[in-house]
Amino acid sequence: MPTLQQLIRFGRQQVMVRPKSAALKRCPQRRGVCVKVYTTTPKKPNSALRKVARVKLTSGYEVTAYIPGIGHNLQEHSVVLVRGGRVKDLPGVRYHIIRGALDTAGVKNRVRSRSKYGVKKA
């Protein structure tokens, strides 16, 4: 516990808050190029093959981003739009690819929650 004199001389040190999506550099989304598209398995209680992509962003970072929805058309060198948002059961995956933007197609036959998966009204 500092004394009053120490507080007058030095003040209190500010607590640094680390950003959850540093690679976006304070932007809502970033464009990037897929370096590798692959599947990975989730943490312990869950079991699946989650589709993810390694993306080189325009900010210079290379991040792992989740591909939401059923089926996708992404491959190496595809240009994608990346937003923040982690996947709870995939360690190290802190970004999502936006469906229906740039080279990423929307989800086929999607009827509900269409705006989240880049599908136009039928």
Curated annotation (Swiss-Prot):
Disulfide bonds: none annotated. InterPro entries: NA-bd_OB-fold, Ribosomal_uS12, Ribosomal_uS12_bac. This is Small ribosomal subunit protein uS12c. SUPFAM superfamilies: Nucleic acid-binding proteins. One of its GO terms (cellular component) is chloroplast. Part of the 30S ribosomal subunit. NCBIfam families: rpsL_bact (TIGR00981). CDD domains: Ribosomal_S12 (cd03368). Its main location: plastid. With S4 and S5 plays an important role in translational accuracy. Located at the interface of the 30S and 50S subunits. Belongs to the universal ribosomal protein uS12 family. It comes from Cyanidioschyzon merolae (strain NIES-3377 / 10D) (Unicellular red alga). One of its GO terms (molecular function) is structural constituent of ribosome. It comes from the Eukaryota. It is found in: Plastid, Chloroplast. The lineage of its organism: Eukaryota, Rhodophyta, Bangiophyceae, Cyanidiales, Cyanidiaceae. Keywords: Chloroplast, Plastid, Ribonucleoprotein, Ribosomal protein, RNA-binding, rRNA-binding. Pfam families: Ribosom_S12_S23. GO terms for biological process: translation.
